[in-house]
Amino acid sequence: MATSATAAATAPAVTAAPVKVPQGATVSTREGEMPSWQIPNVAEAAEAYYGPDSEHLIAQVKSPLAAKSARGLSGFLTKTFTDSGTEEVLINDRGWDGCSYFFPDGKRLVWTSIRDNMNMPMGNWSDWRNYPQGAELYVSDRAGKNVKRLTNNQQYEAEVTVSPDGKWIVFGRMTNGNMDLWVMNSDGTGERQLTFTDDDQEGAPYFLPDNETILFRAWKASEYDQKPTPMTIYTIKRDGSDRKPRTFTHDMNWAPYPTPDGEHFLFVRAETPRNWEVYLGYLDGTTPPKRITFDEGFDGFPAVSPDGRKMVWTSSRSAGPGAGFMSGLQLHVMDVTALGLGPKK
């Protein structure tokens, strides 16, 4: 097992059998990284998150059924599948989908789509100034049935996740060109705004295991044209109090995700404008972050399985020669058992 020297130096010693590698997958043991592999049989995809069984994933996957971009390229729709690349299920069959997440019961899903607002401008999921204003939030079962629309206001709503106890949904909403965090009950009632900042643009919220603390990232509208855009990762309480920075460098700290032990978080940092890497951060506020990926290109959207043993992330490392920086993105899994990120007993 190849293990990052820097990560292993600070992580607790963990003795466990290696994570099972899917049949047909090729294990990568590149220098500095723990063993990883590309998920087979899944099309280009981004932002995958584990379900409670630490095996099934939900993600937006490129699909010919999705709406086309302004350049005529196929969009993305929500699917679930295993991290072995089996049991693929199409959850939504029209429009263009964004972020999605499992409820902790493993029976329900929450996802973002423009499916009911196709008469509105498509916008651009990657451009804050042009987010799709028709993006709404939905809940369904694991078969994509029993769909319930949670929002109905023709504003951009996305970046949606669920608390570990299943009682709360947190998401990002754009109002009058400004992004803020909102929380509501898991049935869609009781919407409440958490952040009220003019310059800071908050998003990517995730609950920590305590169901009270929310990890998120923010950038300043006044700095958006700097590339890579400076971003800071914060925590805030569910009632909107106790906002604290968790990264302390004025560069791009992006795509945070809390680990099941409640002590760490994954995030992405831009080493150069075209080399983004995954890091392990520490919520103690004093321990320097440790680099997890080592590849020239795009490594982003990291998430940890609930058992703490696997990290899924999106990478361009499998793209062919001449591919663009964020082109040909595929999902990969890394065996991070050695980091000891599982739930505290």
Model-derived regions, located:
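Long, low-complexity intrinsically disordered segments that are proline/alanine-rich
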Residues: 1-18
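Multi-bladed beta-propeller domains
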Residues: 17-44, 80-96, 140-156, 184-201, ...
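A flexible loop/linker signature enriched in serine peptidases of the S9 family
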Residues: 41-42, 60-77, 91-97, 112-136, ...
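Residue-level detector of Asp-centered blade-edge/turn motifs that repeat once per structural unit
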Residues: 52-53, 104-105, 164-165, 209-210, ...
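Hydrophobic beta-strand positions that form the internal "hydrophobic ladder"
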Residues: 57, 109, 166-169, 214, ...
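Right-handed parallel beta-helix/beta-solenoid
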Residues: 166, 198-203, 211
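Blade-level signature of beta-propeller repeat domains, shared across WD40, Kelch, NHL, RCC1
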Residues: 303-345
